[in-house]
């Protein structure tokens, strides 16, 4: 297995931070699995795929909703079938909304928690299952400095990212002895389409 080209799977991979991660891994010789809510035929998704192909990466692009168990089962099964290994999985997909804590609706809170926290858990779940089969792997959860310090008018995002950090620490302890390394990145504000909406 070590002689095969390595593979990275990235959720929210069509644009923004996901695309930046994909480009860096392609530059380092990885094949790339991109999962996104966008259809792979979308012009923005196609631009990313083209750039990765030009860097020499073989790309599998899959429309997948991280809030959907069937979608995520399908995503990981397709990735495994195509490449036969998952060296790195980056749980990058996420959303954000703004508002004072006391003004938020149930719907606003539940949407961010479902995508940013539960969607990350779902990504980690399937990543771990496949990595346990091969005996190694690295999972990287995209958290935020908001999950460390709190940020006014970002209560939902802060709650979710605090949860992601707890998930990361727990999973790292569960699988660290099994050859799987789990970490979180905590970037500050990044200029991406998510932050411009």
Q: Predicted regions span which residues?
A:
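Active-site loop immediately N-terminal to the catalytic Tyr-X3-Lys motif
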Residues: 102, 149-155, 177-178
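Active-site helix of classical SDR
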Residues: 124, 160, 168
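Alpha-helical segment proximal to the catalytic Tyr-Lys
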Residues: 129, 173-174
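Substrate-binding pocket helix/loop in short-chain dehydrogenase/reductase
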Residues: 100-101, 105-113
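Conserved glycine-rich Rossmann-like NAD(P)H-binding loop of the short-chain dehydrogenase/reductase
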Residues: 30-46
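Residue(s) in the substrate-gating loop at a strand-loop-helix junction
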Residues: 144
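Canonical Rossmann dinucleotide-binding motif of NAD(H)/NADP(H)-dependent dehydrogenases/reductases
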Residues: 2-33
